[in-house]
A protein has these predicted regions:
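Sec-dependent signal peptide recognition
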Residues: 1-7
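Bacterial signal peptide processing site
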Residues: 12-15
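N-terminal membrane-anchoring alpha-helices
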Residues: 17-20
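N-terminal low-complexity, Pro/Thr/Ser-rich intrinsically disordered segments
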Residues: 25-64
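C-terminal functional module detector
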Residues: 40, 45-56, 71, 78, ...
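A metal-dependent hydrolase metal-coordination microenvironment
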Residues: 52-198, 203, 210-227, 247-253, ...
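Alpha-helix boundary recognition
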Residues: 86, 174, 236-237, 283
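Functionally critical loop-and-helix segments that line ligand-binding/catalytic clefts
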Residues: 227-236, 274
């Protein structure tokens, strides 16, 4: 957690080894945003829920992957999108239209962060994915300061290597003045590996979607492909600093059974109710990801990782501590804690009896 601040310049970083393997890819996006945004460079932490003082850190619920009409694959207006999240008591969202930055629009209670989903759908990527040869390089630039007009052209079309393609996206994030980089649905059509994710993190990405509710099968993996949790642990064991996000990748806001409906995955950030503070807390890993579980504590304290489910939350819960890629403890109940190891990391996964989950970020000494 302490090391995360060193990477707050989310869009820049060092060189890393190249991953190997091959994958193919056609073209078809699925990530974007809307038309309302608040300028928000990086820096800072926490926010409130009711009416807490402006300087008080509170838990803030938000989505870092949202689409609107400007994305090309959603029919909802920006106003409609903002209204949907406001009505459900979200505190913030990031507008991430495909290869487009929507100019900021203010005057809403919902904090709207400017962003873009850099989208490239080539074929035949390396490492390989499945036999379809489809490949999806989708990267969110969050909290951008630049406002390019029209479509952003950024893709490296002269390589088949995923790492080089991701590097092109990271470079574009720098050009856009992004505060954070998020890797979206990395297992879509497979191809992501722990060493590749670690290399991408080393080059500047701080967030990765562990759970994208539109891609459940890809998140969970199968007999031939690792889950995103497994890939995340692999990257963490290689020393990477990268935080796990849950998102709805929303495109549909009217029909809950439509294609890519809103809701179902989000992050809850400990920060002040301020755009820069929210971005700073995301960069520092001061948040948990959720598909329905509500936590009141998810933080290190006195050398331990402490996890507590809200006292009024219904259902039964299992809290699992994963230490250096292996299940270290399993507690049935609403609260648990585990000592932070001298070497490596520990993270937690909370599962409710209905299948809803919360991912607590890894901590190190």
């Amino acid at each position: 957690m302490k090391r995360a601040l060193l990477l707050l310049a989310a869009c820049g970083a060092a060189e890393a080894p190249r991953a190997a393997g091959p994958v193919s890819v056609p073209s078809t996006p699925a990530d974007a945003a809307i038309d309302t945004v608040i300028d928000a460079p990086p820096i800072d932490a926490p926010a409130p829920v009711a009416a807490a003082p402006a300087d008080q850190e509170v838990w803030l619920k938000g989505s870092t992957h949202v689409h609107a009409r400007a994305s090309g694959d959603s029919t909802e207006s920006v106003e409609g999108v903002i209204g949907w999240y406001e009505a459900r008591h979200y505190d913030f969202i990031a507008l991430t239209d495909h290869n487009h930055v929507t100019p900021p629009e203010q005057g809403h209670s919902l904090i709207v962060l400017a962003g873009s989903e850099l989208t490239f759908n080539p074929s035949g990527c390396l490492p390989e994915g499945d036999k379809s040869k489809k490949c999806r390089i989708h990267v969110n630039a969050l909290g951008v300061t630049e406002r390019p007009v029209g479509k952003i052209e950024w893709a490296n079309r002269h390589t088949h290597w995923r790492l080089d393609m991701y590097q092109a996206a990271i470079d574009e994030c720098r050009h856009l003045g992004a505060a954070l980089i998020q890797i979206n649905h990395p297992q879509w059509y497979w191809g992501m590996t722990g060493d590749l994710l670690a290399a991408i993190a080393h080059r500047g990405a701080l967030l990765v979607e562990i759970s994208n509710i539109q891609f459940t099968t890809w998140n969970q993996g199968d007999a031939d492909h690792p889950s995103m949790d497994t890939i995340w642990d692999d990257a963490l064991m290689r020393g990477a600093t990268i935080w796990g996000v849950a998102s709805d990748d929303a495109h549909e806001y009217v029909d809950p059974h439509g294609k890519w409906p809103a809701g179902g995955g989000w992050v809850v950030v400990k920060a002040r109710r301020d755009p820069r503070a929210i971005l700073s807390s995301l960069a520092a890993g001061r948040f948990y990801a959720s598909t329905g579980v509500v936590l009141t504590r998810a933080e290190p304290e006195s050398g331990e990782l402490v996890v507590e489910v809200g006292p009024d939350e219904r259902g039964s819960y299992v809290i699992e501590f994963v230490e250096n890629g292996k299940l270290a403890d399993r507690v049935v109940g609403k609260s648990a804690r585990r000592a932070i190891p001298q070497n490596g990391y520990v993270r937690a996964l909370v599962t409710r009896d209905d299948g809803a989950k919360a991912w607590v970020q890894p901590v190190r000494r």
